[in-house]
Regions:
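Short, surface-exposed polybasic-aromatic patches that bind anionic ligands, especially phosphate groups
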Residues: 1-93
Length: 93
């Protein structure tokens, strides 16, 4: 699964938008947002999902930034500094 370049745009111009996410953490976080956010995002074309419901790509920088900021509220226990490269990876899962 590839997270697109739009994810890296989440942190462009902003430092420490959200904490670092180790393998699997990003997927679990998005599952937590699924009921309240992802349905509308998918319908509007901001996020595409494959049959396994894993994130395929972001296509909107504004929406990527919005959910990145929500991460601080959802995973407050992750206090490490964010590394943009950890989100922009072909091997994130």
């Amino acid at each position: 699964m590839i997270i697109s370049a739009a994810c890296r745009a989440v942190v462009n111009g902003e430092e420490n938008v959200f904490p670092i996410m180790r393998h699997g953490d990003f997927y679990r976080w998005m599952k937590m947002l699924h009921c309240q956010y992802n349905k509308a995002a998918v319908e509007q074309g901001f996020i595409d999902w494959n049959e396994e419901k894993r994130i395929e790509r972001f296509v909107s920088r504004a929406e990527a930034a919005k959910i990145a900021k929500e991460c601080n509220q959802i995973l407050p226990h992750m206090r490490e500094e964010f590394n943009p490269n950890c989100l922009y990876s072909e091997d994130i899962y």
